[in-house]
Amino acid sequence: MQNGKIKPENLLRRSPTNRKLTTGCEILDGCLRGGISCDSLTEIVAESGCGKTQLCLQLSLCTQLPISHGGLNGSSLYLHSEFPFPFRRLHQLSHTFHQSNPSIYANYNDNPCDHVFVQNVHSVDHLFDIMPRIDGFVGNSKTRFPLKLIVLDSVAALFRSEFDNTPSDLKKRSSLFFKISGKLKQLASKFDLAIVITNQVTDLVETSDGLSGLRIGNLRYLYSSGRRVVPSLGLAWANCVNSRFFISRSDGSIVKDRSEKDENCSSSVSRSAKRRLDIVFSPYLPGSSCEFMITREGICAVQA
């Protein structure tokens, strides 16, 4: 490796990592065959309110778990690009996480929130400005929890108002997609990090050439809240990520009894809006899905 770049002839010599980051839910981990892969870019696509940020917050805490418990024994960097960061929700989840894993913090004067580093990113240029600092932060971390997870929530927000739909802007935007994903993949490979990126959806607009219905991955169509949707940023961005998970929301609710064992369900009966995670494409996962709900304690999947 020279200047942080991997030579093509060395790609086949590298041993792929098998390390996974638990989602904090045993059923959801089963769907993902252990959780989120390290040394990889994982994208979570969903409309607002489906739970993609909730899952990312939960992953940020689960990173601190020991490797024997599905964690990475590390800290996380949360890059957020829209809305105020949900500190209140993070503290709520942190309290539950601390109660469930007191031994991690018993001999230290800290708490789970101390190991979730939050950075606002307000533009593409800003993201590129802080990339060198991220590289230095990961490489020179001397804390008891080295950085092991980077979350970018969300990538679509960075491009929402900066570019028009002109050929020149679309070309420039595609180039930036590959630069961003290339740098994140470089960090993931160099430091064996898990990288999670959220993306939004737009309503499907049918076109005369039929390209709007182009199939990418395991699902022919994507539906959420009764609408047919497509991931934002198009095919160029889809080619930049290793795995894509789609979270949808539908009418109705899930009622889950406490007899279905899951640490994230505290009441005897829990009721929540119905949500579903689908694996759209992944090099290491077959197509599958899992229903879940969001409780006060976190994401709680439902056994099929």
UniProtKB/Swiss-Prot annotation:
Keywords: ATP-binding, DNA damage, DNA recombination, DNA repair, DNA-binding, Nucleotide-binding, Nucleus. One of its GO terms (biological process) is meiotic cell cycle. InterPro entries: DNA_recomb/repair_Rad51_C, DNA_recomb/repair_RecA-like, P-loop_NTPase, RecA_ATP-bd, XRCC3-like_C. The keyword Thylakoid does not apply. GO terms for cellular component: nucleus. Interacts with RAD51C. Belongs to the RecA family. RAD51 subfamily. Plays essential roles in DNA damage repair in both somatic and meiotic cells. It is important for postsynaptic events following pachytene in meiosis. It is also required for DNA cross-links repair and is involved in double strand breaks (DSBs) repair. This is DNA repair protein XRCC3 homolog. It comes from Arabidopsis thaliana (Mouse-ear cress).
